[in-house]
């Protein structure tokens, strides 16, 4: 009888070890799958802005060298999934003053004010062919047909990804 008990214990141990091994394998597989999904849920951003764009304050800025009229400047930005720059805060104004050398077409926000610059707008953008031009630290009303440089702006890749997928 004692030999029979040893055989039963041996079979039970073998069965238990097999079940534990399979459970460990299943848990390990689940761990690998979850880790991979988590890892790939957060893309690797080697660059948050495209080549030739400058990153600042969660946005990317593109300063053109070629000059175009205001309408073509707006179209150029649209083609690059961006928009003509607007000065919605003093930080953006200071950034462009520091890096943008020359005159650039700008857009204006709906309340038609630019922080840090005191001036009055008596016109609507694009009406009567008058548009806004930023020159170092001044805003100038200018005919939209003149050719000037452009600054396009868009969210950086990380900010865009975060607002798309994490909220």
From Swiss-Prot:
Ranges of residues in domain C-type lectin: 49-152
Transmembrane residue ranges: none
Alphabetized PROSITE patterns for the sequence: C_TYPE_LECTIN_2 (PS50041)
Protein name: Putative C-type lectin protein FPV008/FPV253
Keywords per UniProt: Disulfide bond, Lectin
Upper lineage: Viruses, Varidnaviria, Bamfordvirae, Nucleocytoviricota, Pokkesviricetes
Pfam families documented for this protein: UL45
Gene3D superfamilies (alphabetical): Mannose-Binding Protein A, subunit A
Molecular function terms, GO-annotated: carbohydrate binding
Record-linked InterPro entries: C-type_lectin-like, C-type_lectin-like/link_sf, C-type_lectin/matrix_domain, CTDL_fold
Disulphide bonds in the chain: 77-152, 131-144
